[in-house]
């Protein structure tokens, strides 16, 4: 269900010729049909949400095709022209380097980088926002970047919740409870849902849910009897906050709305929204 202000609506893409119009319409159809309430203050916030989801997906595929390597923090490596490898295996932006240039370099020269899956997901989020922000704004928000697991910049606002409905562009987590300690890096897999039953996980590539579970199960202890599984954790960019920094070039997605109800009482506790 999609709510704009206090109105329950069925949005649609007005310009069928805009980039990725069909994919964005699919996002809207999924969100409209889900039980979860997707609440936005304005149409511009919803437009941003659609575009950031699309850029998360395209950035995930770009990273997959870049040659970016899977490594543990012990063996991680980076392009030293833009980043300094920390003692813990993270990547610290070099002084005087623009974060926008350094993030783009990861996608341009992926073979010069290697790290684990959580860091890769945060890199994808940064790249998606870079596509929607002026470089000056991006560099201001994300100066002095550190890429290291979930230690992301304080200006990157994310929402993590449970029991929601998965929409393309969401980050999900596969858990492997009986992982072999000899390959502890396979205790789970962070993955971007690409839509149409496919996910991208750094280290596993583009796979279905069943294929990712199969790969994780293959890395369990010999006597394992509990299968890996897709958890109900969902992580998203907080479009209500992050949309305020977006550039208006390129233009926002043009949306039309079919009104369903305009007197909804909207109650939000944490990241869960309920309609009365």
Curated annotation (Swiss-Prot):
Tell me, in a sentence or two, what this protein's role is.
Answer: Probably plays a role in the assembly of the spore coat proteins by catalyzing epsilon-(gamma-glutamyl)lysine cross-links.
Q: What is its EC number?
A: 2.3.2.13
What domain of life does the UniProt record list for this protein's source?
Bacteria
Which controlled-vocabulary keywords does the entry list?
Answer: Acyltransferase, Sporulation, Transferase
- A Gene Ontology molecular-function term? protein-glutamine gamma-glutamyltransferase activity
Which reactions does this protein catalyse? L-glutaminyl-[protein] + L-lysyl-[protein] = [protein]-L-lysyl-N(6)-5-L-glutamyl-[protein] + NH4(+)
This protein is called Protein-glutamine gamma-glutamyltransferase
- Recorded family membership: Belongs to the bacillus TGase family.
């Amino acid at each position: 269900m999609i709510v704009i202000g206090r109105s329950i609506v069925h949005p649609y893409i007005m310009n069928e010729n805009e980039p990725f119009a069909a994919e964005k319409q699919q996002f809207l159809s999924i969100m409209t049909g889900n039980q979860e309430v997707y609440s936005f203050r304005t149409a511009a916030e919803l437009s941003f949400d659609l575009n950031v989801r699309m850029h998360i997906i395209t950035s995930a595929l770009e990273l997959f095709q870049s040659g970016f390597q899977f490594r543990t923090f012990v063996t991680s490596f980076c392009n030293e022209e833009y980043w300094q490898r920390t003692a813990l295996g993270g990547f610290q932006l070099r002084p005087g380097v623009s974060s926008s240039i350094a993030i783009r370099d990861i996608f341009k020269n992926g073979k010069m980088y290697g790290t684990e899956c959580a860091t890769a997901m945060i890199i994808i989020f940064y790249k998606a926002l870079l596509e929607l922000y002026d470089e000056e704004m991006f560099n201001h928000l994300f100066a002095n970047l550190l890429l290291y697991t979930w230690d992301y910049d304080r200006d990157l606002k994310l929402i993590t919740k449970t029991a929601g409905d998965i929409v393309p562009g969401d980050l999900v987590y596969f858990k492997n409870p009986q992982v072999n300690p000899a390959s502890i890096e396979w205790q789970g897999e962070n993955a971007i849902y690409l839509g149409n039953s496919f996910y991208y996980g750094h280290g596993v590539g583009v796979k279905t849910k069943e294929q990712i579970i199969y790969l994780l199960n293959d890395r369990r202890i010999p006597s394992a009897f509990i299968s890996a599984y897709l958890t109900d954790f969902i992580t998203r960019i907080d479009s209500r906050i992050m949309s305020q920094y977006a550039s208006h070039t390129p233009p926002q997605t043009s949306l039309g709305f079919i009104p369903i109800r305009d007197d909804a009482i909207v109650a939000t506790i944490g990241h869960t929204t309920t309609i009365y």
